[in-house]
């Protein structure tokens, strides 16, 4: 199976190997740390040639995701890859996420991450929600009820920026811990995650419940769900890096 040009995955070619590590591991390893029985990445020429220098074969990594996507669509010809947006929409269906297939991929990814965050907020008590709003620097919250605080958090997430990226990393990290048994390298930045570490508990519990139901649906989803969440987070990281560069350029003028 060859890589099908996919504009939603082309940005992976711009990333460093350290960024691609999480996606590689999601595609290759299961929760027990053993290689997935049907993974083809580590037997590829690209892997044998470049090893952990993932940036050298980002296209082959994207191809592997398309391959797993084809395994979750019974209607597709075996061996023919599926474009990322179709995989993402299939994942959203499994997670019961509301979305419009005609909208931009980034918006669908945002809806997916928002759904997980929303469900984690539902599991928090009033004090936890208030604490999170304080950490996110949401102002004038003293007179807001729990529902309004949750709405403010979701609105902040959808507005984008560093706080949105921070929340996305925490959501993705909780998914990785639950599904893969380990966190993401993206979450290694303590400055990024330490202030919102309390959120990983509720998110992890929610994902555990969701995963128990989804696991029966087929082994392909054990890959495509965390892979889509990692891709969405990497895209946010790229967008945030671009915004930071623009800000620096403006300041230097």
Curated annotation (Swiss-Prot):
Domain of life of the organism encoding this protein: Bacteria
Disulfide bonds: none
Pfam families membership: DUF3944 (PF13099), Ubiq_cyt_C_chap (PF03981)
InterPro entries: DUF3944, Ubiq_cyt_c_chap
Family membership: Belongs to the UPF0174 family.
Protein name per the record: UPF0174 protein jhp_1494
Organism: Helicobacter pylori (strain J99 / ATCC 700824)
Lineage: Bacteria, Pseudomonadati, Campylobacterota, Epsilonproteobacteria, Campylobacterales
């Amino acid at each position: 199976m060859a890589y099908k040009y996919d504009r939603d995955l082309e940005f992976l070619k711009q990333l460093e190997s350290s960024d691609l590590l999480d996606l590689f591991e999601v595609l290759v390893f299961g929760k027990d740390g053993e290689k997935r029985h049907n993974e083809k990445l580590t037997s590829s020429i690209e892997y044998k040639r470049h090893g952990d220098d993932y940036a050298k074969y980002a296209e082959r990594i994207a191809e592997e995701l398309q391959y797993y996507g084809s395994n979750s669509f019974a209607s597709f010809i075996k061996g023919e890859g599926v474009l990322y947006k179709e995989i993402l929409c299939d994942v959203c269906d499994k997670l019961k996420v509301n979305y419009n297939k005609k909208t931009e991929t980034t918006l669908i990814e945002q809806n997916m991450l928002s759904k997980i965050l929303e469900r984690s907020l539902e599991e928090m008590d009033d004090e936890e929600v208030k604490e999170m709003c304080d950490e996110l620097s949401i102002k004038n919250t003293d007179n807001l009820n729990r529902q309004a605080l949750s709405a403010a958090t979701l609105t902040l997430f959808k507005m984008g920026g560093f706080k949105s990226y921070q929340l996305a990393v925490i959501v993705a990290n909780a998914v990785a811990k639950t599904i893969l048994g380990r966190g993401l390298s993206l979450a290694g930045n303590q400055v990024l995650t330490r202030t919102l570490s309390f959120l990983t508990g509720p998110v992890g519990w929610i994902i555990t419940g969701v995963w128990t139901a989804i696991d029966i649906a087929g082994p392909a989803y054990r890959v495509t769900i965390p892979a889509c969440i990692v891709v969405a987070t990497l895209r946010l990281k790229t967008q945030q890096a671009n915004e930071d560069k623009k800000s620096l350029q403006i300041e230097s003028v």
